[in-house]
A protein has these predicted regions:
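AMP-binding/adenylate-forming catalytic core of the ANL superfamily
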Residues: 36, 63-151, 161, 174
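Flexible lysine-rich "adenylation lid" loop at the C-terminal edge of ANL adenylation domains
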Residues: 153, 159-179
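Conserved S/T- and glycine-rich ATP-binding loop of Class I adenylate-forming
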Residues: 5, 143, 168
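Active-site donor-binding acidic/aromatic loop of nucleotide-activated sugar
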Residues: 54, 158-159
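Generic structural signal for residues in well-ordered beta-strands
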Residues: 25, 107-109, 156
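Conserved beta-strand termini and adjacent loop/short-helix elements that scaffold enzyme active sites
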Residues: 3, 28, 110-112, 159
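Residue-level detector of flexible, active-site-proximal loop/helix-junction positions
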Residues: 7-10, 88, 163
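Conserved AMP-binding/adenylate-forming
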Residues: 1-3, 7-72, 78-81
């Protein structure tokens, strides 16, 4: 079972994409917005912009979609999104596409500064044991088979392992700093 929630919602409020009774979910400009009985009234010392600015609602930093069935899908985080050529690419979706390539054991996608595009999509991959290192063209074609071409990496770096933060999540910022200069 996958739980979605945060301190502002008194913990989990959506389970396997289905909100609990009394919980409201909507998508506003791609962001997940939550409301209902479990929601905090606000912050003691509000930040700007205040995610509680709309009474009864909390604007998260998560990007999501609500399917026709009403199931919430969290697609990524606003701060991870890559703005390339005026379009938004969610690294988690590109990573999911790359992960289906048989030569990719692990991967991370991140944005680096680009004069023309704003940011360009870059991937770091760990090659599966016994596999031949895939080419950039091969990985781009693989991503384009599942996602729009703007999501395909414009460069790929092969690593022995991905850098991780203390909690085990991939450190995209470290990758962007390493390969963005």
């Amino acid at each position: 079972m996958r739980t979605y929630g945060m301190s502002e919602t008194a913990g989990g409020c959506v389970y396997d994409g289905v909100q609990l009774d009394g919980v409201l979910v909507r998508i506003d400009d791609g962001r997940v917005v939550l409301g209902g009985a479990t929601l905090a009234k606000g912050y003691r010392n509000p930040v700007e912009p205040d995610p509680f600015a709309e009474p009864g609602w909390f604007r998260t930093d998560d990007i999501g979609a609500v399917e026709d069935s009403g199931v919430l899908r969290v697609l990524g985080r606003v701060d991870d999104a890559i703005s390339t050529g005026g379009l938004t690419v969610l690294p988690q979706l590109v990573e999911a596409a790359l992960a289906t390539h048989p030569a990719v054991a692990d991967c991370a996608v991140f944005g680096v500064a680009d004069e023309r595009l704003g940011q360009r999509v870059v991937a770091a991959v760990v090659v599966a044991t016994g596999s031949t290192t895939p080419t950039l063209a091969e990985l781009r074609a693989h991503v384009v088979s599942a996602l729009p071409s703007t999501a395909a990496p414009r460069e790929v770096h092969v690593l022995d392992e991905l850098p991780r933060r203390g909690i085990g999540k991939v450190d995209r910022r470290a990758l962007a700093a390493r390969f963005g200069g």
